């Protein structure tokens, strides 16, 4: 990716995040966070990775369907904000970024391992005390 393409990706990420926060926060429930963006070399498509803080998979899927249906509207708002900074306004494609959920899953796994280790140490001490 060229430096220009990277800059456009950063600009698109920042501006789409602002648009979602300011213009769509009331319509997009649960909260949506744009975690990263990637733009094709010809600037025709921006791949936006989003994390959705929903309680259920159904909520998250519904939010992504809503994002997809709003993509053209969001692109028009993006165009009005960045038209003077870029040659072409990319088409927006939203994808689910599972990295935050994966990090949370790993953290929970480490917590369970730590708890199991502590329990085994306590059980080991208890059985050592019983032998004395």
Swiss-Prot record:
<comment type="function">
    <text>One of several proteins that assist in the late maturation steps of the functional core of the 30S ribosomal subunit. Associates with free 30S ribosomal subunits (but not with 30S subunits that are part of 70S ribosomes or polysomes). Required for efficient processing of 16S rRNA. May interact with the 5'-terminal helix region of 16S rRNA.</text>
</comment>
<comment type="similarity">
    <text>Belongs to the RbfA family.</text>
</comment>
<keyword id="KW-0690">Ribosome biogenesis</keyword>
<comment type="subunit">
    <text>Monomer. Binds 30S ribosomal subunits, but not 50S ribosomal subunits or 70S ribosomes.</text>
</comment>
<keyword id="KW-0963">Cytoplasm</keyword>
<protein>
    <recommendedName>
        <fullName>Ribosome-binding factor A</fullName>
    </recommendedName>
</protein>
<dbReference type="GO" id="GO:0030490">
    <property type="term" value="P:maturation of SSU-rRNA"/>
</dbReference>
<dbReference type="InterPro" id="IPR015946">
    <property type="entry name" value="KH_dom-like_a/b"/>
</dbReference>
<dbReference type="InterPro" id="IPR000238">
    <property type="entry name" value="RbfA"/>
</dbReference>
<dbReference type="InterPro" id="IPR023799">
    <property type="entry name" value="RbfA_dom_sf"/>
</dbReference>
<dbReference type="GO" id="GO:0043024">
    <property type="term" value="F:ribosomal small subunit binding"/>
</dbReference>
<dbReference type="GO" id="GO:0005829">
    <property type="term" value="C:cytosol"/>
</dbReference>
<dbReference type="Pfam" id="PF02033">
    <property type="entry name" value="RBFA"/>
</dbReference>
């Amino acid at each position: 990716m060229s430096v220009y393409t990277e800059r456009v990706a950063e600009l698109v990420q920042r501006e789409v995040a602002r648009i979602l926060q300011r213009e769509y926060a009331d319509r997009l429930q649960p909260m949506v966070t744009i975690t990263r963006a990637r733009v094709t070399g010809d600037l025709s498509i921006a791949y936006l990775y989003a994390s959705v803080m929903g309680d259920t998979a159904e909520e998250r899927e519904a939010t992504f369907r809503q994002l997809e249906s709003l993509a053209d509207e969001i692109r028009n708002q993006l165009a009005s904000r960045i038209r003077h900074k870029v040659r072409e306004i990319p088409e927006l494609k939203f994808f689910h970024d599972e990295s935050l959920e994966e990090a949370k899953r790993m953290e929970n796994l480490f917590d369970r391992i730590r708890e199991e280790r502590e329990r085994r140490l306590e059980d080991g001490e208890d059985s050592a005390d019983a032998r004395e």
